[in-house]
Amino acid sequence: AYSNLNYLRF
């Protein structure tokens, strides 16, 4: 699972 900050980066 990806963190909230991870998906905002891509």
Curated annotation (Swiss-Prot):
The modification Phenylalanine amide is found at F10. GO terms for cellular component: extracellular region. It is found in: Secreted. Keywords: Amidation, Neuropeptide, Secreted. One of its GO terms (biological process) is neuropeptide signaling pathway. Its main location: secreted. Belongs to the FARP (FMRFamide related peptide) family. This is FMRFamide-like neuropeptide FLP2. It comes from Penaeus monodon (Giant tiger prawn).
